[in-house]
């Protein structure tokens, strides 16, 4: 979407006090007169065919887990949010399998963060993720390990294997 606000300023009246420089400039150029004329354009390829509409509110938690692997990021985010809101812990084993064995790295990442949202990431799982080929997962696993280091600083030795990781995201998180 592209938004053409068709307006000189974005500020609301509360942010533009009378007597201020910006207030005088807005009045001088008439920027406050041009309101309610904005447009929103939806930009899409001429051959774009929309997919099926989601009906996630009517789906089971197990069905929502499948959406964590969806190619569309909105579907992944929405499924993750609904899973956590529901608090259905019966799907934790399925999430662990997706986090470690899923084909799509983004699906694995969403499964991992969903497990973390349930406070169900442990050192065993995270050490498996440290060897994942995708650097986003390795960096996320490091981040999830940090609270566990507060519990027992000896766990820091697990991170030594990542000290030479060539990817900058992993190095920065470490």
Q: What do these predicted ranges mean?
A:
Residues 84, 116, 146-147:
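Structural signature of alpha-helical solenoid repeat scaffolds
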Residues 6-8, 46-48, 118, 135, ...:
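Short, glycine-/Ser/Thr-/acidic-enriched flexible segments
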Residues 57-65, 88-100, 119-131, 150-163:
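Amphipathic alpha-helical scaffolding segments comprising HEAT/armadillo-like alpha-solenoid repeats
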Residues 1-63, 74, 84-85, 155:
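Beta-propeller domains with acidic blade repeats across secreted/periplasmic ectodomains
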Residues 76-77, 106-109, 139-140, 157, ...:
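Alpha-solenoid HEAT/ARM repeat scaffold
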Residues 73-74, 104-106, 135-136, 153, ...:
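Alpha-helix N-cap/helix-start positions at coil->helix boundaries
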Residues 1, 59-108:
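Long hydrophobic segments that form regular secondary structure
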């Amino acid at each position: 979407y592209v938004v053409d606000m068709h307006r000189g300023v974005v500020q609301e009246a509360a942010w533009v006090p009378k007597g201020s420089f910006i207030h005088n400039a807005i009045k001088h150029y008439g920027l406050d007169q041009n309101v309610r004329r904005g447009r929103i354009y939806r930009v899409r390829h001429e051959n774009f065919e929309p997919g099926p509409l989601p009906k996630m509110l009517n789906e089971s938690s197990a069905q929502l887990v499948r959406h964590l692997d969806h190619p569309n990021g909105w579907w992944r985010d929405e499924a993750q949010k609904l899973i956590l809101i529901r608090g259905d812990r019966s799907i934790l084993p399925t999430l662990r399998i997706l986090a470690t064995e899923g084909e799509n790295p983004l699906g694995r990442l969403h499964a991992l963060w969903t497990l973390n949202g349930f406070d169900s990431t442990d050192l065993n799982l995270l050490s498996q993720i440290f060897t994942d080929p995708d650097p986003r997962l390795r960096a996320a696993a490091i981040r999830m390990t940090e609270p566990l280091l507060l519990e027992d600083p000896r766990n820091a030795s697990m991170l030594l294997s990542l000290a030479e990781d060539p990817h900058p995201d992993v190095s920065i998180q470490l």
